[in-house]
Amino acid sequence: MAAMAAKLHISTKSDQSNVRLPRLINLSRDPTARVLFPRNGSVSSLHTNFSSPNIMVPCAGGGGGGSIGNHGGGSGSGGGGGGYGGSEEEESSPWGPLGLFIQGWRSRVAADSQFPFKVLMEMLVGVSANVLGDMASRPNFGLNELDFVFSTLVVGSILNFTLMYLLAPSAISHGSSNLLPGIFRSCPSSHMFEQGNFTLMNRFGTLVYKGMVFATVGLAAGLVGTAISNGLIMLRKKIDPSFETPNKPPPTLLNSLTWATHMGVSANVRYQTLNGAEFLLEKSLPPLVFKTSVIALRVVNNVLGGMSFVTLARMTGSQSVEEEKKIEMSEISEKEKED
């Protein structure tokens, strides 16, 4: 009996020596750790979301150990099917709106290396051409309406940069069609000529959606820009009481609604077409010729934009000229005298 007991004791020790004991995991060190169990009923491996991606956790219950992190099997991350870690969620920037803007800028530069050059040309050449087009559409080249021209300069500078930023493709939105809300989810997220497998209705949906966005931005920028320009004119009057503007200051709300209409219709169509043209030219032209074409296209685009805004402002009455009214009244009085 003693010999049999000794033999049994030795056999149990040899069996235990071949069993790999499970390692203990201290989950208190990482309170954000997630443990995932397979749905097939066998606990063969644990997939967690630790910072170390290659820790092996063998578990009792059969099967080999799976790896923790982005390379696990089953329902782990990387293979889909309910796992974690397939795509990292974007964290809010500690710098607030400025940090979000910097992240958005980097994302746009990553998607289009020519984006900084386009913005520079838009702000230098484009805004200047916009002001020239605005002045060319006014009597006496706008010299009698410099207050209106200044208002256009302030609002146009804000809007031109905003248009460039909103229409530029980003590294996140490049090739994506699910970034827009509601019924526009299947539409291109940047502009209607964005590369991708989109239908004609999808691209038209982007035109409509961006038009609503630009109209909203135009309304906000019109309110801010008109208030700034009118405030500066009032400040000038306080400093120099003899200063008189040749025209009445533009009504803030009416001028803002005019800008909203201009942005949602004219600017929306022009800038989306411009983005599509630049996309095609970048693929077919040498870099130097392409940059030259960018400058030329933006000059033409902004001259047309300035002229179209003056026409719309005249139609809505947001920028009425006092001298024109005086001339009309004098002509009427002269006709009455002749009669």
From Swiss-Prot:
<dbReference type="Pfam" id="PF11891">
    <property type="entry name" value="RETICULATA-like"/>
</dbReference>
<feature type="transit peptide" description="Chloroplast">
    <location>
        <begin position="1"/>
        <end position="58"/>
    </location>
</feature>
<keyword id="KW-0150">Chloroplast</keyword>
<keyword id="KW-1133">Transmembrane helix</keyword>
<dbReference type="GO" id="GO:0009536">
    <property type="term" value="C:plastid"/>
</dbReference>
<dbReference type="InterPro" id="IPR021825">
    <property type="entry name" value="RETICULATA-related"/>
</dbReference>
<protein>
    <recommendedName>
        <fullName>Protein RETICULATA-RELATED 2, chloroplastic</fullName>
    </recommendedName>
</protein>
<keyword id="KW-0934">Plastid</keyword>
<feature type="transmembrane region" description="Helical">
    <location>
        <begin position="213"/>
        <end position="233"/>
    </location>
</feature>
<comment type="function">
    <text>May play a role in leaf development.</text>
</comment>
<keyword id="KW-0217">Developmental protein</keyword>
<keyword id="KW-0809">Transit peptide</keyword>
<keyword id="KW-0812">Transmembrane</keyword>
<feature type="region of interest" description="Disordered">
    <location>
        <begin position="68"/>
        <end position="92"/>
    </location>
</feature>
<dbReference type="GO" id="GO:0031969">
    <property type="term" value="C:chloroplast membrane"/>
</dbReference>
<feature type="compositionally biased region" description="Gly residues">
    <location>
        <begin position="68"/>
        <end position="86"/>
    </location>
</feature>
<keyword id="KW-0472">Membrane</keyword>
<comment type="similarity">
    <text>Belongs to the RETICULATA family.</text>
</comment>
<feature type="transmembrane region" description="Helical">
    <location>
        <begin position="148"/>
        <end position="168"/>
    </location>
</feature>
